[in-house]
């Protein structure tokens, strides 16, 4: 080992002076947002992020940065699959902040909540997804990687050339993550596209449907996940909408956290966390439907009897566990073989491969971040085998899980496809990490104009002297009122911390506690028809049969009521720290507005 060289005090002083000079130079021009928390985050990112030298990726924001001292012992880079989105300019961020302070919120009509997929993705336009370019076995790995890089840059150039940044939504700019999708599609016999029932057209890119069913010739199963967060009539309406527009789809309803929609919500426990214990994962709604869909696709080419037997065992075990009152450990179930795929698995396997090789059906699970892909796998297995998180981008690389000896599941990292969605809606859909949003106030305004946030949370206008008087609300007022109600204060000046309050409101929306559900076209006119539809009644009965049966316990902390609930996982977002130990507002007893909503009103006196 070489001898350490002495480092004098004079040298150390010079080193610190140089470091201060470098920081001072990097911070020039960023004074406009120097007093805000989001401004300091933006400065840190601009100091650390470097462009790749390509014009289309010049303003890319890299999220979920992990500390790294170079490659690990196995050559693994923890930042290889982090989310890459286009960066908002400082001028655009400041403009949205001013609008959040000045624009008075007006409630929108029910027709505004109707989303048509043709308006979101514009099928036939350049809003496609990158395809793996043609290749041959004569090409070296370096040649193939270089060709894929050039093809990906051309793909980005076409999109940014056809649409301005203001019209485009956030979408994935990381080629490494798209390569994961290519590999999963190549190795799959059946593709599951998981969507969130609250906004399924947001998570359903028609280009992927055309590619899977057309070019690849594979069966595509659409999973409408988290059906516990939407009214049963709306779930059935969305199911028929996709059947009508995409006849080759197999549609399956799923939730890992079923609840009986006929049971009134207890207003005093809506915002308390229900922690699943024992065999809670075995009560998932949907495994039987998915099995029937796979049987219809494979038509006897694969023996799926072991899967049916497993579902029967899970149901019997859950019933026995609930009846006996004994708590079962999740680890008591049979072992699940897990394969973590390395770079060697990313090598091309050839233009074609044998379908149902060795009598095993491979089911690929793809979808947007935060739609519950990992929770779906846990629900199918019957216990927790995949860690889940509210933070988008939690799944870093694809893994395979043998559900039975003849059924293999493949979990792909979440991918954001390009679209024309409002970016505020993407934030509310959980696509963008909330803790890293530069400006969360307009997303709060988007939410408050579609559901009565002020009334639901019993907020008092910050400028109101008379509580009974009507005052116009803007997004900033809502955040300030929530900060006052929750006691969110800044560290030094003890002012209302509106940034933390905005993040808190967005988390309530993403978790489903403030539930914003979008409708298919024409739903408002035909709502009565869907409510009396036979499939709606059947879904209500089915949810009631598999709903909670005493295997949950409430804790004095905030509840995660969506299907992407964290089980023993702490949210790694910085702004989440400390929120779980605070008092949660509850509704006053006998509140006349408490109904079967997934969220309930919070009482004035009990906050």
From Swiss-Prot:
Report residue spans for region: Disordered.
Answer: 1-81, 547-607
Where does this protein hold GTP? 225-228, 367-374, 411-415
Residue spans with biased composition (Basic and acidic residues)?
Answer: 15-26
Biased composition (Basic residues) is annotated at 1-14
What Gene Ontology molecular function terms does this protein carry? Answer: GTP binding; GTPase activity
Q: Which residues carry this modification: Phosphoserine?
A: 32-34, 51, 68, 324, 561-563
Kindly give the InterPro entries that the UniProt entry links to this protein. Answer: G_CP_dom, GNL1-like, GTP-bd, P-loop_NTPase
According to the UniProt entry, which residues carry Phosphothreonine? Answer: 48, 50
Keywords, ordered alphabetically: GTP-binding, Nucleotide-binding, Phosphoprotein
Q: What Pfam families does the database record attribute to this sequence?
A: MMR_HSR1
Q: Which residues form the CP-type G domain?
A: 178-418
Note the superkingdom of the native organism.
Eukaryota
Q: Where is the composition biased (Acidic residues)?
A: 550-584
Q: Which family does it belong to?
A: Belongs to the TRAFAC class YlqF/YawG GTPase family.
What's the domain remark here?
In contrast to other GTP-binding proteins, this family is characterized by a circular permutation of the GTPase motifs described by a G4-G1-G3 pattern.
What's this protein's function?
A: Possible regulatory or functional link with the histocompatibility cluster.
Q: What name does the UniProt record give this protein?
A: Guanine nucleotide-binding protein-like 1
Gene that produces this protein: GNL1
């Amino acid at each position: 080992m070489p001898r350490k060289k002495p480092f004098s005090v004079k040298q150390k002083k010079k080193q610190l002076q140089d470091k201060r000079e470098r920081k001072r130079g990097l911070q020039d021009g960023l004074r406009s947002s120097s007093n805000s928390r989001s401004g300091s985050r933006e400065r840190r990112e601009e100091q650390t992020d470097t462009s790749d030298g390509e014009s289309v990726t010049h303003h890319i924001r890299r999220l979920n940065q992990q500390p790294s001292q170079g490659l690990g012992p196995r050559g693994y880079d923890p930042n290889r699959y982090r989310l890459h989105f286009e960066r908002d300019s400082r001028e655009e961020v400041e403009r949205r902040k001013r609008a959040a302070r000045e624009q008075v919120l007006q409630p929108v009509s029910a027709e505004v909540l109707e989303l048509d997929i043709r308006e979101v993705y514009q099928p036939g336009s350049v809003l496609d997804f990158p395809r793996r370019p043609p290749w041959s076995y004569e090409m070296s790995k370096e040649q193939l990687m270089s060709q894929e890089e050039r093809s990906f840059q051309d793909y980005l150039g076409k999109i940014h050339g056809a649409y301005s940044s203001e019209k485009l939504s956030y979408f994935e700019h990381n080629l490494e993550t798209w390569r994961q999708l290519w590999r999963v599609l190549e190795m799959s016999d059946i593709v599951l596209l998981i969507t969130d029932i609250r906004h399924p057209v947001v998570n359903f890119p028609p280009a992927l449907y055309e590619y899977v069913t057309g070019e690849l010739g594979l069966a595509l199963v659409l999973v409408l996940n988290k059906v516990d967060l939407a009214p049963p009539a709306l779930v059935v309406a969305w199911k028929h909408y996709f059947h009508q527009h995409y006849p080759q789809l197999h549609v399956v309803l799923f939730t890992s956290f079923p609840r009986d929609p006929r049971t009134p919500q207890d207003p005093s426990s809506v915002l308390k966390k229900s922690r699943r214990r024992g065999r809670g994962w075995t009560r998932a709604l949907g495994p039987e439907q998915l099995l029937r869909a796979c049987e219809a696709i494979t038509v006897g080419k694969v023996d799926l009897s072991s899967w049916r037997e497993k579902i029967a065992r899970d149901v019997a075990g859950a019933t026995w566990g609930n009846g006996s009152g004994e708590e079962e450990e999740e680890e008591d179930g049979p072992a699940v073989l897990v394969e973590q795929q390395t770079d060697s698995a990313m090598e091309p396997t050839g233009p074609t491969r044998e379908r149902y090789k060795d009598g095993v059906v491979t089911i690929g699970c793809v979808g947007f971040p935060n739609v519950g892909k990992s929770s779906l796998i846990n629900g199918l297995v019957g216990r927790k085998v995949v860690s889940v998180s509210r933070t988008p981008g939690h799944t870093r690389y694809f893994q395979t899980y043998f559900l039975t000896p003849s059924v293999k599941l493949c979990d792909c990292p979440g991918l954001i496809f390009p679209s024309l969605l409002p970016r505020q809606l993407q934030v509310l859909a959980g696509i963008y990490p909330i803790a890293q949003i530069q400006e969360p106030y307009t997303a709060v305004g988007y939410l408050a104009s579609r559901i009565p946030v002020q009334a639901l949370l019993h907020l008092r206008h910050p400028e109101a002297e008379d509580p009974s008087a009507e005052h116009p609300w803007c997004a900033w007022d809502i955040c300030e009122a929530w900060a006052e109600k929750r006691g969110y204060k800044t560290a030094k000046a003890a002012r209302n911390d509106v940034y933390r309050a905005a993040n808190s409101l967005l988390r309530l929306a993403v978790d489903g506690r403030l539930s914003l559900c979008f409708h298919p076209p024409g739903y408002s006119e035909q709502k009565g028809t869907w409510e009396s539809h036979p499939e709606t009644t059947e879904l209500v009965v089915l949810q009631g049969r598999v709903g909670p049966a005493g295997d949950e316990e409430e804790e004095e902390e905030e509840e995660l009521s969506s299907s992407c609930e964290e089980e023993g996982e702490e949210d790694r977002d910085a702004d989440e720290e400390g929120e779980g130990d605070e008092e949660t507002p509850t509704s006053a007893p006998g509140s006349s507005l408490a109904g079967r909503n997934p969220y309930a009103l919070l009482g004035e006196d009990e906050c």
